[in-house]
Amino acid sequence: MPLPDFHVSEPFTLGIELEMQVVNPPGYDLSQDSSMLIDAVKNKITAGEVKHDITESMLELATDVCRDINQAAGQFSAMQKVVLQAATDHHLEICGGGTHPFQKWQRQEVCDNERYQRTLENFGYLIQQATVFGQHVHVGCASGDDAIYLLHGLSRFVPHFIALSAASPYMQGTDTRFASSRPNIFSAFPDNGPMPWVSNWQQFEALFRCLSYTTMIDSIKDLHWDIRPSPHFGTVEVRVMDTPLTLSHAVNMAGLIQATAHWLLTERPFKHQEKDYLLYKFNRFQACRYGLEGVITDPHTGDRRPLTEDTLRLLEKIAPSAHKIGASSAIEALHRQVVSGLNEAQLMRDFVADGGSLIGLVKKHCEIWAGD
């Protein structure tokens, strides 16, 4: 399928997707009932969309195009009420978090969807293992060239986005020692990590043509890059965050990305070059492994900086942009999080260290989601 022309969208508009866990009490393992929930709510959603993701234990909540985080929060809140009621009616519960702490990937059923079934044929068991849960944020762009500039600019802050959203320390019943273990699941995919270097939209079109020769790529949705352009929507999509435990944190993360995008496209503070990516995977690993306690390295100077310190510097830089687009509350909340040194991964570990079980942890996450 050829790459569509880049759809011009209003700059800095938002679209947010949350991949949620559908669980079965009282054992709190993943359920295989997302199709039933989607059927139950499809005529009750007035804004946004509730839809399938890869496997039957995943439920995606997606906003419409939103002007700001307040509009997105309102849509999510309304969807949440409908979904929670449907889950209660079917004796199910819903929660966030980047991974389910003890599910077995072998039990996961891929959705009866042509695209997902084709992906299963291409990638085999890797698709079942990809039963993990992330937050994706789309930001509108006026042109394809703007999208490429924005993608490279946001890529500098992938470690910051991962560390602030880290919520997947447990997997397959084990403490992984990672703050965010979810991104590791995609390491075997041939398109894992950053997009190959291009400097403008024309070069991206050539890159996509080359990738399509593999016969594994039918559309941009078949590419699993950390950040990717979405020409159909006219956006850049950031895909590195774990699904937070609360709607409020999800909205704050979206506000961070929207404000960073505004700063990048308004100020144009960087002259991007391929060398920017030399240490990309090392810095990304630091964020996944250690969260905000990680250390990132500048590929041009060799300077090493604590991720906490660099995140505070980013929040300070983008504060004026956040004010202009109505995202100041998000930046202030994230600033408090960084200063406190807490993230959701550490709170999960604290719960278990205090004697809680992994079953109890999922139950608590369901209570947090329902009470947010």
Swiss-Prot record:
Catalysis performed (reactions): L-cysteine + L-glutamate + ATP = gamma-L-glutamyl-L-cysteine + ADP + phosphate + H(+)
Gene Ontology MF: a single term: glutamate-cysteine ligase activity
Keyword Translocase in record: no
The entry's keywords: ATP-binding, Ligase, Nucleotide-binding
Signal peptide: none
EC number(s) reported in the record: 6.3.2.2
Keyword Ligase: yes
Pfam families xref list: GCS2
Family affiliation: Belongs to the glutamate--cysteine ligase type 2 family. YbdK subfamily.
Additional comment: Catalytic activity was tested towards all 20 common amino acids, but was only observed with L-cysteine.
Task of the protein: ATP-dependent carboxylate-amine ligase which exhibits weak glutamate--cysteine ligase activity. However, because of the low catalytic rate, the question remains whether L-cysteine is the actual biological substrate.
Name of the protein in question: Putative glutamate--cysteine ligase 2
Organism: Escherichia coli (strain K12)
